[in-house]
Amino acid sequence: MKKMPMRKRFGQHFLHDSFVLQKIVSAIHPQKTDTLVEIGPGRGALTDYLLTECDNLALVEIDRDLVAFLQKKYNQQKNITIYQNDALQFDFSSAKTDKPLRVVGNLPYNISTPLLFHLFSQIHCIEDMHFMLQKEVVRRITAEVGSHDYGRLSVMAQYFCDNTYLFTVSPQAFTPPPRVESAIIRLIPRHNFTPVAKNLDQLSHVVKEAFSYRRKTVGNALKKLINPSQWPLLEINPQLRPQELTVEDFVKISNILN
């Protein structure tokens, strides 16, 4: 079967290292009864491993040439469904069976952040997620309060999920090699976060507004939203910088606006 060319506009870097692939599958630990969804399967390197472990696998691929390639490669497989679709627009609940989805993939680095936010909006139908991402993005997702990497993505990802940095992947594991290191992350949805955000759009707006002015105090950064008399009610020091606020702090700010 002929090789498929990479398309730069899709941010394609195909994983080929068998040791890394086995390590990823070990981290996912798929079960026969799982419903797995793989985003951006490429030529099917990870797919091949997953098919041996899982009886229900869905692939979401935007590249029509790769879709044709995958359809031909897996035309004898009965336990696989291929969707030609943009993952940023895909309704993940449409792939759901009687069990929550386990979502995996080597996410295109040029759309990884908006794709994560799209997945957060459908978190109710997801059991867990294992992704290959740019190492810098994984560091931001898992960043601690007060650190340089802590920001909007950290707050929103940590509101929706418990996140674990699993391991780093060298550029040499890909064809062509990306210019940056990659990392594998596990995200497990949190369905009982306390306090609960009353309005998720409001929470996202507050967090985005605050980190647009991360060098300012949070009192100044959010002065269009919060008046000075509200800070004592929130029990938050308005002289703190946005990166010094916890996820819980941002939820409290969001909730007082509703």
UniProtKB/Swiss-Prot annotation:
Chief location of this protein within or outside the cell: cytoplasm
Keyword set includes Transferase: yes
Coiled coil (residue ranges): none
Reactions mediated catalytically: adenosine(1518)/adenosine(1519) in 16S rRNA + 4 S-adenosyl-L-methionine = N(6)-dimethyladenosine(1518)/N(6)-dimethyladenosine(1519) in 16S rRNA + 4 S-adenosyl-L-homocysteine + 4 H(+)
Top EC category: transferase
Enzyme Commission numbers on file: 2.1.1.182
GO CC, one annotated term: cytosol
Keywords annotated in UniProt: Cytoplasm, Methyltransferase, RNA-binding, rRNA processing, S-adenosyl-L-methionine, Transferase
Positions that bind S-adenosyl-L-methionine: 13, 15, 40, 61, 86, 106
A Pfam family: RrnaAD
Domain of life of the source: Bacteria
Localization: Cytoplasm
GO molecular function, one term: 16S rRNA (adenine(1518)-N(6)/adenine(1519)-N(6))-dimethyltransferase activity
UniProt family annotation: Belongs to the class I-like SAM-binding methyltransferase superfamily. rRNA adenine N(6)-methyltransferase family. RsmA subfamily.
NCBIfam families hit by this protein: ksgA (TIGR00755)
Function: Specifically dimethylates two adjacent adenosines (A1518 and A1519) in the loop of a conserved hairpin near the 3'-end of 16S rRNA in the 30S particle. May play a critical role in biogenesis of 30S subunits.
Protein name: Ribosomal RNA small subunit methyltransferase A
Gene: rsmA
